[in-house]
Curated annotation (Swiss-Prot):
Organism: Arabidopsis thaliana (Mouse-ear cress)
Record's subcellular location: Secreted
SS bond partners: C45-C53, C65-C71
Protein's UniProt name: Protein RALF-like 16
Listed GO MF terms: hormone activity
Organism taxonomic ancestry: Eukaryota, Viridiplantae, Streptophyta, Embryophyta, Tracheophyta
GO biological process: one example: calcium-mediated signaling
A cellular component term, taken from the record's GO annotations: apoplast
UniProt function note: Cell signaling peptide that may regulate plant stress, growth, and development. Mediates a rapid alkalinization of extracellular space by mediating a transient increase in the cytoplasmic Ca(2+) concentration leading to a calcium-dependent signaling events through a cell surface receptor and a concomitant activation of some intracellular mitogen-activated protein kinases.
InterPro entries referenced in this protein's UniProt entry, alphabetically: RALF
PANTHER family: PROTEIN RALF-LIKE 15-RELATED, PROTEIN RALF-LIKE 16-RELATED
Family: Belongs to the plant rapid alkalinization factor (RALF) family.
Record's keyword terms, sorted: Disulfide bond, Hormone, Secreted, Signal
Leader sequence residues: 1-29
Amino acid sequence: MVAYEKSPIVFLFATMMLVMFLFCGSGEARTLGYGSIKGDRIPACGYKNPNSCVKQPVNHYHRGCEKITRCARDAARYTESFNVDDDESPIINLH
């Protein structure tokens, strides 16, 4: 009599497993191709897409020093005079 009570449970379990294998096992594994991925891609920089090229920042011209800092840009302003004694080296005087 014990086997008679367990048989509906075993039958129900076997039926549920069969239904589960039919629904879950029938699906195919799908892969994504390059066509579906390529739609969201930013076009590469080149002669076909020049607008997508990122422009490099340029180095703007900047003088090394300004006239007010006296960087010897104005050579007429400075004079050189050499004082040579017998034992001394030449001395440059800037006026």
